């Protein structure tokens, strides 16, 4: 193989492995082993965490981000070289984070409020990469709960439509050779 081909292949491979992706998995086989008289019980609706609290398994922290550090470094240089002042650094890596109470409003943090994984809370790491911006974490939490509620309502609708369809009647042959039916008339409300 040519060296350029190997280099391009390795670069593509490393890029595809570095970028996380989510794949929606759809199951094509549906289980119909449930009885038609079974009506699904209602599940408890998931609740959002408090307005100032991070989603479950995340902890609220006040962090200095790399974008704030970059702005602090580039703004003074921008006064001398205007082109440098136009550079913007965006990062969600937390630097020197300190824990915050869930009830504490965002205004008490002079830096960026972030929701960090439990594994990073109280760690001695200078940089915490498993943090998420507070507003983004709350938005994703709301979207996840809405998705779960839509799926559950679709499941309920499917189960109710299956229970409304009549079951097939069984017919047989009597001992004397005459046919009979075990079908019963039942009122159905729609």
Swiss-Prot record:
<feature type="disulfide bond">
    <location>
        <begin position="54"/>
        <end position="115"/>
    </location>
</feature>
<protein>
    <recommendedName>
        <fullName>Class III hydrophobin F</fullName>
    </recommendedName>
</protein>
<feature type="disulfide bond">
    <location>
        <begin position="62"/>
        <end position="109"/>
    </location>
</feature>
<comment type="subunit">
    <text>Self-assembles to form functional amyloid fibrils called rodlets. Self-assembly into fibrillar rodlets occurs spontaneously at hydrophobic:hydrophilic interfaces and the rodlets further associate laterally to form amphipathic monolayers.</text>
</comment>
<feature type="signal peptide">
    <location>
        <begin position="1"/>
        <end position="18"/>
    </location>
</feature>
<keyword id="KW-1015">Disulfide bond</keyword>
<keyword id="KW-0732">Signal</keyword>
<keyword id="KW-0134">Cell wall</keyword>
<feature type="disulfide bond">
    <location>
        <begin position="63"/>
        <end position="97"/>
    </location>
</feature>
<dbReference type="Pfam" id="PF01185">
    <property type="entry name" value="Hydrophobin"/>
</dbReference>
<dbReference type="InterPro" id="IPR001338">
    <property type="entry name" value="Hydrophobin"/>
</dbReference>
<dbReference type="GO" id="GO:0005576">
    <property type="term" value="C:extracellular region"/>
</dbReference>
<comment type="function">
    <text>Aerial growth, conidiation, and dispersal of filamentous fungi in the environment rely upon a capability of their secreting small amphipathic proteins called hydrophobins (HPBs) with low sequence identity. Class I can self-assemble into an outermost layer of rodlet bundles on aerial cell surfaces, conferring cellular hydrophobicity that supports fungal growth, development and dispersal; whereas Class II form highly ordered films at water-air interfaces through intermolecular interactions but contribute nothing to the rodlet structure.</text>
</comment>
<feature type="disulfide bond">
    <location>
        <begin position="116"/>
        <end position="131"/>
    </location>
</feature>
<keyword id="KW-0964">Secreted</keyword>
<dbReference type="GO" id="GO:0009277">
    <property type="term" value="C:fungal-type cell wall"/>
</dbReference>
<comment type="similarity">
    <text>Belongs to the fungal hydrophobin family.</text>
</comment>
<dbReference type="GO" id="GO:0005199">
    <property type="term" value="F:structural constituent of cell wall"/>
</dbReference>
